[in-house]
Structure formats: C-alpha cells, structure tokens
Amino acid sequence: MSLDLLREHRRVFAEKAVLSDVYGVWFDRLLEGLPPKGRVLEAGAGPGLFSPHARRVRPDLSWVALDLIEAAWNDIAADAQVLPFRDATFDAVVGVDFVHHLSTPLAFFREAARVLKPGGELRAVEPWVSPFSYPIYRFLHQEGATLGLDPARPFRKGNSKAPFDGDAGVTRAIASGVEETVWLKAGFDGRPEFAPVNAFAYLLSLGFKKGSLLPRFLLGPMIRFDASFPVRLTAMRVAIRARKPDRAF
C-alpha cells in the first residue's frame, strides 16, 4: 500500500459519509472508558482516519498516531512490532485493521504490553473469519482469508512480505492458536477478549469501493441490527481487548 493509496483512502473516507459513520461506531467502541487525560498510542494508523475522530470526541486524550509509512497526517513513522517508546508510556494502545497485516503479530502484542502502563489496555478491531464471512474474505476481498495460519508467523514469505499484505484469517489464528501462558509471558493478565461483532453495515457500504448499497438514512437501523443479530455464525469483525496487570507479580 503506497502513500498514494493512503491518500485515496482518506479522500474516499471524507467523501463517503456512510463509511465514516460505520467506522465511527468502531472508533467509539475503542474510545469508550479510556481514562481522562490518558496517553494513547494508535498503532497502524495508515490513512489517519481514527485520530481526527478521537481528537474531536476525546480532546482530553494525548494521542500519538503511528504507522510504518511516513505521512504528514500521522505523528511518527515506525514499525508496530518494534515500538520506539519507553516502557510504561501509554494508558492504551488502540488500532483498526492493522494486526492482520503484521508479519510477526505476537511481537506487536509483546511490544504493546511493554509500552502500556500497569492497568493499561490494548484495544483493536480486526477482520474475523466466520462461516458467513469466510467466503466473502476468501473470494471477494483483495487480501483473502487463509485457515490454519501460524499465529506467530502467518505469512510464509517472511522478510519478503510487502508491508501491507494482509490475511483476514490472522486474527482467528491468534485467538485459537495462542495459549494463555504466551499472553501471560507477553505481559498481559491473561488471554485477550476476542468479541466477534457483525459488520453488515460495513459490508453493505462496500467499504472503500465506489458506491454503497446502504443509504445513510438506514445506517442507524442496520447498526442496531448488527448489534442484535447472533454473531456466532455471521461475525465479520472482532473487538480485541487485552489488559496489562496493575502490578507485576
């Protein structure tokens, strides 16, 4: 994904109100309950969609937007798997749609735990493979979806992997293939919460593609339908939440 493509995503997001509204629901979920005047790191900030929303909704937060690609709208260019911050710097680490692009996602989780203050949280929204979403991601999405990935190194290309190659199966592999002892050793208080959520509104919005099948006036009812419909078979996204213990044992 080049800087030009990030600019294109910014343009579409600014012009496509229904898409920004859908993302706004996810952004608000990640912001909910963050401590007043907290210091927050956004990892994988990419086209810089989250930070303007966060700074408008929660102006009390000290926000740092980080991405691998240097861009004027983000604060720092660095690899989320090797974070350039001291231990216990942030009250929260958040992000949307970036974990499934990482060549060594468990390295990121370790780094996130390291830079979190005691009691801090990692929160993210990522693609999720379910019986409903698998064929959509596998056959209709440019990134695809692979079952049975190695959660430590989901991309076999290793160092030859392009920075923004992705696979929707990564998050499911992490949720099902990483034992609790690994999370404890990484610095969290146990296995993260992986809460599947529907994303019919996003699906009907057609994402960053041209047009939308979801009129904006139907967005509210569709989001409520998303929240009320059973998710076990239909979820397309997952909300991840991991907490660092209040103190080391």
Model-derived segments and spans:
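Class I SAM-dependent methyltransferase SAM/SAH-binding core
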Residues: 41-82
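Acceptor-substrate binding/catalytic loop of class I
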Residues: 160-179
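A short glycine-rich, Lys/Arg-flanked "PGG" loop and its adjoining helix->strand segment in the class I
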Residues: 106-121
